[in-house]
Amino acid sequence: MALAKQIMGASLMDQKTSVFGSNLCLNHVLVNKHRLRLRKTRKNGSMVVAAISEDLVKLXRVEKEKPVTFKVRAVLTVRNKNKEDFFKDTIFRKIDAITDQIGWNVVIQLFSNDIDPRTRAAKKSNEAVLKDWSKKSNVKTERVNYTADIMVDSDFGIPGAITISNKHQKEFFLETITIEGFACGPVHFPCNSWVQSTKDLPNPRIFFTNQPYLPDETPVGLKSLRYQELKDLRGDGTGVRKLSDRIYDYDVYNDLGNPDRGNDFVRPTLGGEKIPYPRRCRTGRVPSDTDITAESRVEKPFPLYVPRDEQFEESKANAFSTGRLRAVLHNLLPSMVTSISKKNDFKGFSQIDSLYSEGVFLKLGLQDDLLKKLPLPNLVTRLHESSQGGGLLKYDTPKILSKDKFAWLRDDEFARQTIAGVNPVSIEKLKVFPPVSQLDPEKHGPQESALREEHIVGFLDGRTVKQAIEEDKLFIIDYHDIYLPFLDRINALDGRKAYATRTIFYLNPSGTLKPVAIELSLPQALPGSESKRVLTPPSDATSNWMWQLAKAHXCSNDAGAHQLVHHFLRTHAAIEPFILAAHRQLSAMHPIYKLLDPHMRYTLEINQLARQNLINADGVIEACFTPGRYGMEISASAYKNWRFDLEGLPADLIRRGMAVPDPSKPHGLKLVMEDYPYASDGLMIWEAIQNWVKTYVNHYYPDSAQVCNDRELQAWYAESINVGHADLRHKDWWPTLAGADDLTSVLTTIIWLASAQHAALNFGQYPYGGYIPNRPPLMRRLLPDVNDPEYLSFHDDPQKYFLSALPSLLQSTKYMAVVDTLSTHSPDEEYIGERQQTDTWSGDAEIVEAFYAFSAEIQRIEKEIEKRNSDTSLKNRCGAGVLPYELLAPSSGPGATCRGVPNSISI
């Protein structure tokens, strides 16, 4: 559906800018020049000045000498595939090599910044054909340069655009074009795009030079091309998208369920008045057979649509496929074995450890004789035999085990991970005690917490609770209101048991945290019945195991909220509308598009993969996390409280009470907890991004009125809100876009979310969560009450009870395999402070220089983070058995490194 037009009406860009006004101005100037031109004649030794009539001016223009032509050379850099599919690639490549010789070529044409006064259209070169395509068709290098000789008139001016028609059968990936031979020097066209065959996309592709232009500064010869390119990218909101398409449009999340498989696979539509949610990329697929409001499913290995240039490049796709292969193998074997065996629980912690040392085969007791009896695909057995020691089927040892195998058991490590782990964004300063729920008491029972002063006062170093709050010593992670409305349904699921948890922490004099109470809440069964219980640090063996179970439930709550709310909703889903709107409303020559471009890479592709495999009905999130089929409803419930104006790091820290404004402090903030690794490192990166964006914005918008008058920019921001976040479009907290400072703030927030915030929340998933007891994604048992029949089994063998409460073997291995893949950097990762074609991405030398300064600042920050991780006074990141905090260290190599800040949400 044409959702954008339904909500927004016609785009601002749909108001065509006529070139006639500019041509008339040009003609007026020419006539004036002719009027002022004096013809000197000598007659009888004196100079006679003759006036020139309008007719003579016109005649002079007609008789103007025809310009001569000269030749310039185009060099096109095309990237080859490393591995070709025989039928898709090899055969078509050979066909293209043959047909290229008979005229089915790649044709290019240059367009000038200037217009031809006679045609009132851009000056154009002759069409030219790429040379030697057939000769170079078998070249195996990663990149191949093709050339073309182009004839242009001497008055052509400066080239501003180039069109390409690919008359071959096969698409090709075009990295750059350089034009040589003009007096102005080499002209660069950064492309980084798939050029489709004209049989798929008949219109020629348009590429612009690296010179950025605001809309009202667009050279007159490029205006119609600028409009046409955006029109092509918007589409008309109808039809089923093909994988070769380049169209960006919006839709709701109506493709997570599969009603055609039965009621168990029905999921509500996310997005709309009933369940608000951000919009996703439209595919146009037909409805399901049984529910016209649900889009039909496309299951792996078949891909969902995203615009062609959003799809993974080859090295990224290969790395992701390898990770998925490992995940498939890790999932396949346990599922086969558990299908023939009822032994589905871990028998001891040593069995969990064996997943890393022995691999999946030995962990499952699959010796060679038993292995041969299982109905495994030949591929699996061959991989096992060929991989050295079965390495492909082993799990890497998570970093949480690398320094101290038993760190996860300690209270101080449980607390440390709330500020230096994979989810450091839930903790808040405790402001009210006891905590109070904001839920409707008619539906969810009393709002009062069961926490009392007597529960925690003994752990406050002689302070009262009131004193501890006033001295900023108490903190809380509160999941009560997020989970409680869903608990009845969650706990009715087979093998799922959950509480709505609150955990209170006390700040020690050393700067570390310790948990002092955990509240576990269930829905009230009957009015007046007890539904809450409070646990405090243990004093004996029995209370120790109860405390460990309570911590596990708190971690399970945290794992779900982290994945569904902070990770997917607040980064992946919330950013997608801004990306869609950028492609639809900002020309590739717009300076703000050039700024955002590296921060949009791969996000649409990874989000469609999430819809297909992770957040869908019976997908990984439902299978591995406590909320099960209700997980995305929890995510949508949190969206009602999402606020873009509070998503920047300083605003978020202030909102959570973790910092207060202080102009005298670095970054203008004073952290309430000085040794808060995520916040202290994050503020350095935030400030670097902010300074870079401010320099960039002020360069192109020296006058704030230019921001208001930039029709593309305003259309982008308006569409992001009114269409992409349509369900919250009437909120009064949306920032205005009325000047350079507003624009700097909006862009800094978007870049922060896409880069550092996502990195902090994503790349620690396996290093911390790969050891299931440290961070169980789901729980299968509640804490036993003394009067419960199962209390005796807990009392007799608490370790067995604890392990039976954790995810099963199958659930654990599936989760471990997936988060291992999701925590991995690909070889082509582009990190903050880097970008493709560093020297030529922009034709503005001052901006290129400013980017190098930004890169240097990022490198300085990396060294500062290394220094902090060696500072023994910072006990939350340095100490015996303590993992250094590197999730915001900017650079990384490939793999699950627990560090590295990519430019974009690329995994």
From Swiss-Prot:
Top enzyme category: oxidoreductase
Cellular component terms (Gene Ontology): chloroplast
Expression sites (tissue/organ): Confined to glandular trichomes in flowers, and, at low levels, in leaves.
Keyword Chloroplast: yes
Known EC number: 1.13.11.-
Record keywords, A-Z: Chloroplast, Dioxygenase, Fatty acid biosynthesis, Fatty acid metabolism, Iron, Lipid biosynthesis, Lipid metabolism, Metal-binding, Oxidoreductase, Oxylipin biosynthesis, Plastid, Transit peptide
Main location: plastid
Cofactor notes: Binds 1 Fe cation per subunit.
Highest rank taxon of the organism: Eukaryota
UniProt keyword Metal-binding, yes or no: yes
GO biological process annotation, one example: oxylipin biosynthetic process
Secretion signal span: none
Domain named Lipoxygenase: residues: 212-907
Pathway connected to this protein: Lipid metabolism; oxylipin biosynthesis; Isoprenoid biosynthesis
Catalytic reaction(s) noted: (9Z,12Z,15Z)-octadecatrienoate + O2 = 13-hydroperoxy-(9Z,11E,15Z)-octadecatrienoate
Function: Component of the monoterpenoid pyrethrins biosynthesis; pyrethrins are widely used plant-derived pesticide. Plant lipoxygenases may be involved in a number of diverse aspects of plant physiology including growth and development, pest resistance, and senescence or responses to wounding. Catalyzes the hydroperoxidation of lipids containing a cis,cis-1,4-pentadiene structure. Mediates the peroxidation of linolenic acid leading to the production of 13-hydroperoxylinolenic acid.
Entry protein name: Lipoxygenase 1, chloroplastic
Gene name tied to this protein: LOX1
